[in-house]
From Swiss-Prot:
Stretches for region Disordered: 1-30, 311-339, 519-551, 679-705
Any one GO BP annotation for this protein: protein transport
Coiled coil (residue ranges): 129-192
Name this polypeptide is given: Conserved oligomeric Golgi complex subunit 5
Keyword Lipid biosynthesis listed: no
UniProt biased composition (Low complexity): 679-702
Membrane disposition: Peripheral membrane protein
Location(s), subcellular: Golgi apparatus membrane
GN (gene name): cog5
Keywords: Coiled coil, Golgi apparatus, Membrane, Protein transport, Transport
Entry-linked InterPro entries: Cog5, COG5_helical, COG5_N
Pfam families the record matches: COG5_C, COG5_N
Length: 898
């Protein structure tokens, strides 16, 4: 009965499998949940029994066999070591018997559950057979579906392949047609000549792009024209390069623009432009090195000059005398020979230097013209100027190079040990250079200045001829440079003003691109730091350091250099020679000043000091004048201002020398018998007086002391130099700042002169005041008419006025006549005369009034003699220039009879 049921179930399952490939597994033949629960209970019971066995007296024996590290050999060897082997066997036998008894009890207790589990296994086998039958039915269904689908699929696949090949063929035919059309256009453009060079270049570029995008090798029509197209490309590049060079030399904007457009169309603009800049730079560098080649300079000297110099030297060496004059003449001959060689060398240097400046100017003008055309010409597709395209391409190339360097640095960094990573990171960050974008004119100019400065320094260190030439005749170098800057200024004013707007557009676009790139780099670095923070702490620090060290930044230095920028940088390159020239000029003039004063101090016990004479001062003035006039003629205001500082220092040195030689004025005492011809004058040394002052008694026969003579000579020397420098300041178009600097030094010289003349004037005025104090001894109130008043033709003055006239005459003849007339002396005399008038009026006002008629006439007569006595003292002008004090004298004279 059960077998029939099973057969029926198999039939039903087979019938169902025909309709569905999968069997119906939701039948009552599956293992129920109750059976699973019974299994769990049986396991629990067995576990409880096991726990009872293993927790008994023999638990330690069972635990030995249950351990994972149980070893039969080890256990057997331990059992053999025991003294009673039979006891161990009995123990194992009893344990085995106990385990067998435990198993029998578990089987007897749970036999129902064990039978159920066996029945479930039989049902599981039946279910497995049913599942296998369903799987086989499913495979048959899939095979039938595969057969139904594969045939149309293969047909569609075949049609798709055919369509793809047709499309590829059409695409290839279109490219061939385009290629043939471009070749035809290229031939037409080439027949037109240089007018269509840019179009020919565009055709060649498109042909190259077609060949690059798709593999056209193996096609006869293309392979046959590869060599011809390459020849045409080389020919176009050659013609365009020649046209570009000619356009740059002739300043032809059309030729340069056409050539640049050709290079741009052929995608070689960046390469060609920088190649031209490098070639132009090398040409100038070659001229610089040729100029500063000492051996070549000596080789270029005239052979006759060198031969004559050798003969003269030999003849001079054969003459030996003990006379100092002859030795001096021999030295002069040698110096003259050296001067001849130096002069010939100088001529050769300046000729080459002039050629260098011309080459530098022409090369710079060519680069500026090229830059100007690059700014003006635009790409017809993007409408960007070619300069912008050039700079962007250059920026990309530099960025790629720097990224490659950074990748190499990172690879090296990863290969090093972990302890050295921080040190390597710091080194990497220092080696990372920001990308600098500059105009081509700036690149050219920087390269030239660097080479010029380095070669000048090397040549100066290796040759005294070049060093002396460029130092002693530095104004010539400055003159060449100023002429260069002047011509460059004219060119910039004419040709550079029309590209300011285009330059500002390029500058804005480049800054925007660089800003975007820098922001992208910063974002990528921040992302790297975030990713590194998710890793371990040690790797995080190294990753963040590495990311910070590989940051790529770009900066711009896009400026159109003005003439002032070129001038500043050009003169900066020869700044050392300018400094040396100023030091040389100062040394030359200081040597002359020191030669004027071989003895800077002097005392009354020694001989008279050596005072510079007029010829020596003329030589000093000529030296100063020649240096300044040289620079004024060159219109070198900047160097002239620096030279004026040097002249100021020389004048200060002269002033210090003069000041150190000025002698104390002494204490001048007026002799009481100054009106007597028998009185004598001289110098009396008072032992109780100050050592720096001497008591000098003067009268009409006395003469100035040696100290006063020295001071007078020093005054005259200072005034002569001051007058010469003042004439220079007024005759030359100097800057106001330079004039102020020189006048400041001249004021110190004038101060010394004032200190020389002022004590003498004060002493003279003191004596005059003493004479005027005797006016009270005169009789101003006697009415008697004297012979003096009757005989007016031989009219004389009062006795005090006679003494005054004698003193004035003595002072003028013995002192004032020795001083060089100048404005300072005239001002001092005017001031003294003004004080004389004031003090005379003071004493007159102290006289008792009224005067007698005789006294009034006498006073008027004295006033007249006073005017006549002081008038000869004035260096220039009349007595009326005294001013207010003279007006007071006139008014007082008129008021006597009122």
């Amino acid at each position: 009965m059960n077998n029939n049921n099973n057969n029926n179930e198999g039939v039903s399952s087979s019938s169902s499998s025909s309709s569905s490939p999968l069997p119906n597994i939701s039948s009552p033949n599956l293992i129920s949940n109750s059976n699973i629960e019974n299994d769990i209970e049986i396991k629990k019971k067995s576990n409880n029994n096991n726990n009872n066995i293993f927790e008994g007296d023999n638990s330690h024996i069972y635990n030995q066999f249950l351990g994972e590290d149980f070893n039969v050999v080890h256990y057997t060897s331990n059992a053999l070591k025991v003294s009673s082997i039979s006891l161990s066997l009995n123990t194992l036998t009893s344990c085995t018997r106990e385990l067998g008894q435990e198993l029998t009890e578990n089987i007897t207790t749970n036999y129902d559950d064990l039978f159920k589990l066996a029945n479930n296994i039989k049902e599981l086998d039946q279910l497995t057979d049913t599942l296998k039958l369903g799987v086989s039915n499913l495979e048959e269904s899939i095979q039938r579906m595969k057969n139904d689908i594969s045939e149309p699929y293969n047909k569609v696949k075949s049609h798709i392949g055919q369509l793809k090949r047709v499309q590829d063929s059409c695409e290839l035919l279109r490219k061939l047609i385009r290629y043939i059309q471009l070749v035809k256009k290229l031939k037409n453009h080439l027949q037109a000549g240089s007018r269509d060079l840019s179009k020919s270049a565009q055709c060649i570029n498109e042909i190259n792009l077609l060949k690059k995008d798709s593999d056209l090798t193996g096609i006869n029509i293309i392979d046959s024209q590869v060599v011809w197209i390459k020849t045409c490309s080389d020919q176009i590049i050659t013609i365009s390069s020649t046209l570009l060079y000619q356009g740059m030399e002739n300043q032809n904007q059309t030729d340069v623009a056409n050539s640049l457009q050709v290079f741009h169309n052929m995608t070689i603009l960046n390469e060609k432009v920088y190649s031209i800049v490098n070639l132009t730079t090398e040409k100038v560098i070659k001229n610089i090195k040729a100029l500063l080649n000492v051996n070549k300079l000596i080789a270029d000297l005239p052979k006759t000059t060198i031969t004559n110099n050798i003969n003269n030297n030999n003849s001079n060496n054969n003459i030996t005398t003990n006379n100092n004059n002859n030795n001096y003449n021999n030295n002069n001959n040698n110096n003259n020979n050296n001067n001849i060689i130096s002069t010939s060398t100088d001529k050769s240097i300046w000729l080459k230097f002039e050629s260098l400046i011309d080459t530098l100017y022409s090369s710079l003008i060519q680069i500026l013209h090229l830059q100007r055309v690059l700014l003006k010409i635009k790409d017809p597709l993007t409408h960007k100027s070619l300069m912008e395209v050039l700079l962007i391409k250059q920026h990309q190339l530099q960025q790629q190079q720097q990224q490659q360097q950074q990748q190499q640095q990172q690879q090296q960094q990863q290969q090093q040990q972990q302890q050295q990573q921080q040190q390597q990171v710091g080194t990497t960050s220092n080696n990372t250079q920001p990308i600098l974008i500059e105009m081509i004119s700036t690149l050219f100019w920087k390269s030239i200045l660097k080479v010029l400065e380095n070669n000048l320094l090397v040549a100066a260190k290796s040759s005294n001829i070049i060093e002396n030439t460029f130092i002693r005749e530095y104004p010539k170098v400055s003159k060449f440079f100023l002429d260069f800057i002047k011509k460059l200024q004219n060119y910039i004013d004419i040709h550079q003003m029309d590209i300011q707007q285009q330059f500002m557009i390029v500058l804005s676009n480049i800054n925007q691109i660089i800003g975007n790139n820098n922001s992208n780099n910063s974002n990528s670095n921040s992302n790297n730091s975030i990713e590194s923070s998710l890793s371990t702490s040690s790797s995080s620090s190294s990753s963040s350091s590495s990311s910070s060290s590989t940051t790529t930044t770009a900066t711009t230095s896009l400026i159109l250099l003005s003439a002032d920028d070129y001038k500043l940088s050009l003169f900066k390159s020869i700044g050392l020679f300018e400094k040396a020239y100023l030091e040389y000029s100062q040394s030359k003039m200081s040597t002359i000043v020191n030669g004027l004063f071989p003895q800077s101090t002097w005392s009354s016990r020694s001989t008279l000091p050596v005072i510079p004479n007029g010829k020596q001062l003329v030589d000093l003035s000529k030296t100063i004048w020649s240096e300044i006039e040289w620079l004024v003629g060159n219109n070198d205001r900047q160097l002239l201002g620096k030279l004026m500082l040097v002249v100021s220092k020389v004048i200060d040195l002269f002033s210090s020398k003069i000041e150190s030689m000025v002698q104390p004025p002494g204490l001048i005492v007026l002799n009481s018998n100054i009106g007597s011809s028998s009185s004598t004058g001289g110098v009396n040394n008072n032992s109780n007086s100050n050592n720096n002052n001497e008591i000098i008694t003067i009268n009409e026969n006395s003469k100035p002391t040696p100290s006063q003579t020295v001071n007078t000579l020093l005054f005259n020397v200072s005034i002569q130099l001051n007058s010469s420098i003042q004439s220079l300041l007024t005759s030359q178009p100097l800057e106001r700042e330079s004039i102020i600097v020189i006048e400041k030094s001249l004021n110190s010289l004038i101060t010394i002169c004032t200190n020389i003349i002022t004590p003498l004037m004060n002493s003279f005025f003191t004596h005059i005041e003493q004479i005027f104090s005797t006016i009270h001894n005169e009789d101003w109130y006697n009415e008697k008419t004297t012979k003096m008043l009757i005989n007016k033709s031989n009219q004389t003055c009062s006795s005090y006025m006679e003494s005054f006239k004698t003193l004035v005459n003595y002072f003028q003849n013995q002192y004032l006549m020795r001083f060089t007339p100048c404005q300072l002396l005239n001002n001092q005399i005017k001031s003294m005369i003004s004080k004389i008038f004031i003090v005379y009026l003071k004493y007159c006002s102290l006289l008792k009034q009224p005067f007698s008629e005789n006294g009034k006439l006498k006073m008027v007569n004295d006033l007249t003699h006073l005017e006549f006595a002081v008038t000869p003292l004035l260096v220039s002008g009349g007595i009326k220039e005294i001013g207010e004090s003279y007006n007071l004298i006139r008014n007082y004279k008129q008021s006597i009879f009122n």
